[in-house]
Regions:
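Conserved, mostly hydrophobic/aromatic
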Residues: 33, 37, 45, 64, ...
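Internal, glycine-rich beta/alpha segment that forms the wall or movable "lid"
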Residues: 84-188, 202-209, 213, 217-219
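Hydrophobic faces of well-ordered beta-strands that scaffold small-molecule active sites
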Residues: 3-7, 41-43, 73-75, 103-107, ...
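Active-site mouth loops of central-metabolism enzymes
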Residues: 9-23, 78-86, 164-174, 232, ...
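Short, acidic/polar
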Residues: 20-32, 91, 174-181, 284-293
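Glycine-rich, proline-tolerant flexible connector loops at the mouths of alpha/beta enzymes
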Residues: 40-64, 79, 194-200, 305-316
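An alpha-helical appendage that flanks or caps ligand/catalytic pockets
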Residues: 5, 124-159, 200-300
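N-terminal beta1-alpha1-beta2 module of alpha/beta enzyme domains
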Residues: 1-68, 72-73, 168
Length: 329
């Protein structure tokens, strides 16, 4: 099982820091992930709200690529219903070229109401738009002839293709269990955020089994899960930061997540999430040992959310390096 880092470039909760400082934090996170031997750094795309300060992951991924040599770099996710897929294909092909073929391409359909409202996209159409845009995106990255949706558009081929052929590894993130068969049928890898969707690792294991059972014969796809991780001497400090993060998230996230919390408040309680096993806070050795449980249930990659709730960048980077060392030992 691989260990990676994942950031939403969180700007909440207050006191707010300058956006440029948060971008510098992400570059420092990339440095720490590379030094700590982690597999990848993944960055989320968000718009119009302080819970996510990266509206353009290709820009930030390219900056991280300039500072690293081995670390894979991923977006999780590119929100396909909001974008013109041919333009996305051009941007991510460039990132893959600039990084020497290190791009992981995670895609999703979006879930935050404000983002749909800001782009003028009807959430009822997101599944259909996702399917259509993904088909065009993959065809464009593969060098096939594609056509934009505007009536006056002519067929074109990209003049810059990714290093990885036919395209970078594709991951699809889902929040609802009923979407898992859709990912499996496509043969894509699956990304999950279990603290927001399931109650315990046993439920997560059931989702992973369901995914693998529905993959087409002969297809090898992977499962990644996002967990809040802190490896250091101040787990109490990290626990307080996690609760701040959860409080801010509840105010900005999807109706689905808010309804989930109403039915089961543990999804927004730091201690409950820690007790469920989806937040691992402790010494580097303790966290590394507890991570192995996820390998046993079929997880291929843990996406560690290290920079939550306003934790100092120095604390975050030390945690990443220490856990990376413990995981490899």
């Amino acid at each position: 099982m691989r260990l990676s880092a994942f950031t939403v470039v969180d700007g909440a909760p207050l006191p707010a820091r300058p956006v440029s400082d948060r971008y510098a934090d992400v570059l420092g996170l990339a440095d720490a992930a590379e030094a700590g031997g982690l597999s990848a750094l993944w960055i989320a795309e968000h718009h119009f709200q302080p819970g996510g300060l990266c509206p353009s992951p290709p820009v930030l991924l390219a900056a991280c690529g300039e500072r690293t040599r081995r670390l894979r770099l991923g977006v999780l996710v590119s929100v396909l219903p909001f974008h013109r897929p041919i333009e996305l294909a051009e941007q991510y092909a460039m990132v893959d070229r600039l990084t020497g073929g290190r791009l992981n391409l995670g895609v999703g359909s979006g879930y935050i109401p404000l983002e749909f409202e800001g782009f003028g996209v009807d959430p009822a159409t997101k599944r259909e738009r996702f399917d259509r845009h993904l088909e065009t995106l993959l065809a464009a990255l593969d060098g096939q002839e594609v056509r934009a949706e505007e009536p006056s558009a002519r067929p074109v081929r990209l003049n810059v293709l990714p290093v990885q052929r036919p395209h970078p590894p594709i991951w699809i993130a889902v929040q609802r269990r009923e979407a898992i068969p859709f990912v499996a049928r496509r043969g894509a890898s699956l990304a999950l955020v279990p603290y927001a969707t399931v109650a315990n690792p046993e439920e997560l294991a059931a989702e992973i089994r369901e995914f693998r059972e529905q993959l087409p014969e002969g297809v090898r796809a992977e499962v990644a899960v996002a967990l809040h991780l802190y490896a250091g001497a101040q787990p109490g400090l990290a626990r307080e930061a996690l609760q701040r993060y959860l409080d801010a998230r509840l105010a900005t996230q999807s109706v689905f997540y808010q309804e989930k919390v109403q039915r089961d408040p543990h999804h927004a309680d730091a201690r409950a999430i820690e007790a469920s096993g989806f937040a691992l806070l402790g010494s580097p050795r303790e966290v590394a040992d507890r991570l192995r449980r996820f390998a046993e249930i079929g997880v291929d990659e843990v996406l560690g959310i290290f920079d939550f709730g306003g934790l100092a960048a120095s604390e975050v980077q030390a945690s990443v390096r220490a856990l990376g060392d413990a995981w490899r030992s």
